[in-house]
Amino acid sequence: MSENINEIAGVEPSFKMDELKFNEKGLIPAIVQDHYSKKVLMMAWMNKESLEISLREKKTCFYSRSRQELWRKGETSGNVQHISSIYADCDKDTLIVEVVKEGPACHTGAESCFFEPVYQNEEITPFSYEGLYDLIMGRKTNPKEGSLSLIHI
């Protein structure tokens, strides 16, 4: 199948389906990411047919390895994922699908399927605006020589 992916999606051509590297079972991993927050929501598998459906409908469609059938995300739950973009990695063997979601991604009701911590380095704290504000206010209270934050405070 050498049909142009962007022709399927209805935009200017630049990428062919044959350039993607599906595994021996005809599948490619698709990492689904929130368009706005960039949070990873889930990982599912696509075959050529589910990718074509996703491009045509602009909603995620995957291939279920356990049921061996296509499934459209949100078909029964209502938690539809509207596709904003799809990127292939440098090896063209994995996709990132950016979506605007309606509801949680996980069948458990969680926003993301990735909520079970395996390891978390306590020395590295996650970014937050609150933390940034505290850092800037700390620099105001206790100026650090050479800090650019001193210029505007």
State the predicted function of each range.
Residues 9-17, 27, 41, 46-147:
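C-terminal binding/interaction regions
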Residues 32-35:
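Short, acidic, Ser/Thr-enriched surface-loop or helix-capping motifs
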Residues 23-25:
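Short, flexible loop/turn motifs enriched in small residues
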Residues 151-153:
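Conserved small/polar residues in nucleotide/adenosyl-binding loops
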Residues 38:
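Carbohydrate-associated surface elements
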Residues 1-11:
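Short, compositionally biased leader-like segments
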